[in-house]
Structure formats: C-alpha cells, structure tokens
Design a protein with these regions (language model features):
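NAD(P)H dinucleotide-binding glycine-rich loop of Rossmann-like/cofactor-binding domains
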Residues: 96-176
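Conserved hydrophobic helix-helix packing surfaces used for dimerization/oligomerization
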Residues: 9, 37, 172-173
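Conserved Rossmann-like nucleotide-cofactor binding loop
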Residues: 45, 78, 181
Length: 195
C-alpha cells in the first residue's frame, strides 16, 4: 500500500493551541475504499471551534477540519465515478462506513468516526472514505469556487433540518440563531417558498 507523506498541516495540539506541523506521523496508508485529495480550501465548523475551546475531548478527536474542497490526487478504487484530477468537496467525513451504525444509515453514531479522515482538512493532502456503499465526497462543478465548495457539508445539514421541519410553500417559519448554519437554513427554507 502507498504511504502518503504529508508536508504540512495545522494541528490542534492542546485546547486553544494550533501548530503548523511539517510532518504528520499519524496518517494511514492509502487502502481500498480510500481517496487521496490535495486540499485547496477548508472551512471552520462549529465542532472545530468547540474542540479548540475545550468543549470536546481531544482524546476522542484525532483530526481538525472536515469541511474542505480539493482535487483528487489518487482515486483509489475509483468508486462512484471519482477520477484523478476531479474537483471534490467533503461531506460528513468522520465515519468509518463499515460498522453496524454506518451500514444502517446512522453514520453520526459511528464508533470509529476519526478513522475515515486523517489527518483532517487543514493539511495539504488528506484521505477520505469512498466505497460503492458509502462516499463522503461529491464532485464540484467549475461554476463553484473552492471556498464556496467547503460549505457543502453545512448546507447538507441545513437542508436536512429544513426537510425534517416539513415546511411547505406558503408556510411561515422562524430560524433561531443566525450564525452560518442559521443563515444557510434560512436561505434554503426561503428557496422552498416559505416566509
């Protein structure tokens, strides 16, 4: 199996302490079902901020940054039509795709969340799970720039909330909290014809 040599990454080494590292020793080998991506942009998620501020356990988090875009450097098995040179964006990138929860549509309860994305999105290269059954990357059209593409995962989350709210054209809805997620949810709900 090919070993990936990472040149640099931003790592959270302690609560409130980010360090630019020149060598990432914890990246695993490219294995079947894995895609290597040259990262071009990475956004900061609320979960990254919570980790930075010490509201989440560093022991349970081995990566930093999961909302990113980039170019496929090695498509691995090439599942789901992913090809070398393709522009992609990540989605929920932390689940393993193999455990009972993942196989039953509950990736947010994966017990191996940290193994699917190492060393994270704040690096020059990273690995993402992509199998015929489970993929965490989506192609990005040329009409969307790299920075905007990093919003794929939070947009999917906001869309899921809008669908679960079961609002329909002509309904009235209120979104509490106008941070990034609230703003995205408000735009999605508005596009559905909701006041």
């Amino acid at each position: 199996m090919e070993r990936i040599d990472i040149m640099r990454r931003v790592a959270l080494v302690d609560y409130g302490k980010l360090v630019l590292q020149d060598n990432c020793g914890d990246i695993k080998a490219l294995e079947p079902g894995t895609v290597k991506i040259d990262v071009t942009a990475c956004s900061i998620c609320g979960s990254d901020i919570a980790l930075y501020r010490g509201k989440r356990s560093l022991e349970n988090e081995r990566y930093f940054g999961h909302e990113f875009s980039g170019v496929v450097a090695d498509p691995g098995d090439g599942a789901n039509g992913i090809k070398k040179g393709m522009r992609v964006a990540s989605e929920l990138s932390r689940a393993c795709g193999h455990c009972w929860n993942c196989r039953n549509g509950l990736p947010n309860y994966c017990r191996s969340m940290n193994d699917a994305l190492l060393p994270g999105g704040f690096t020059e290269e990273t690995l993402v799970l992509n199998t015929p059954e489970y993929s965490f990357i989506s192609p990005v059209p040329d009409t969307i720039d790299d920075i905007t593409a990093t919003l794929l995962e939070p947009t999917n989350c906001a869309y899921h909330v809008a669908r679960r709210a079961d609002v329909k054209h002509g309904d009235t809805a209120v979104v509490f909290g106008m941070g990034p997620m609230g703003l995205i949810a408000a735009r999605i709900i508005k596009s559905m014809g909701v006041d």
